[in-house]
Amino acid sequence: MNLIFLAGASGNTQFWNPLIEQLPNNYTKQVIAYPGFHGTAAHPDIHSFDDLSNYVVAQIQQPSILIAQSMGGIFAIAATLQKTDLIKGLVLIATSGGINLERFKVQDWRQLYRQEYLESPDWFVTTKVDYEEFLSTIEIETLLIWGDQDPVSPIEVGQYLNQI
């Protein structure tokens, strides 16, 4: 089985290395880098969040389980909705999953993100993705992993996603 790893908003693909090193060799492991993020060269056709999402989804070309953290979970949901024949499972770690987080009174990550990642495009933090109405159509096995001390994606978000 192919395992595809999607990083959070930093785009740091090395985030996954400690986990990947522990996995058996019979899994194919693919880490998708985000063009223009964390030292990955920019792509001339990526000018919006939708462009980046479409780029990520286009990288998935064989049956796979997606393992995604934070912002990567939004790309994983997009891929699952668009490539139902190829996505065989989801592991979502502390992600919004594309729902509106206002009801959860979460800490806004955008200001701190802008200060830390000055090179990131403005559209990355201003875009609001809403997949909530489509989440109930996802029928594949999904594992939700949350920490109970996360101010950006608190455990209540994971509990809510589990109910959908």
What residues fall within each predicted segment?
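Conserved HGGG/HGGXW glycine-rich cap/lid loop of the alpha/beta-hydrolase fold
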Residues: 1-41
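The conserved beta1-alpha1 loop
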Residues: 4-8, 69, 146
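Active-site loop/oxyanion-hole signature of alpha/beta-hydrolase fold enzymes
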Residues: 21, 30-65
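Flexible "cap/lid" loop of the alpha/beta hydrolase fold
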Residues: 45, 49, 77, 81, ...
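Gly/Ala-rich beta-loop-alpha elbow adjacent to hydrolase catalytic centers
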Residues: 68-76
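Active-site nucleophile elbow and catalytic-triad environment of alpha/beta-hydrolase enzymes
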Residues: 118-134
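Short beta-strand/loop motif that positions the catalytic acidic residue
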Residues: 138, 144-146, 150
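Conserved alpha/beta-hydrolase "acid-adjacent" motif
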Residues: 151-157
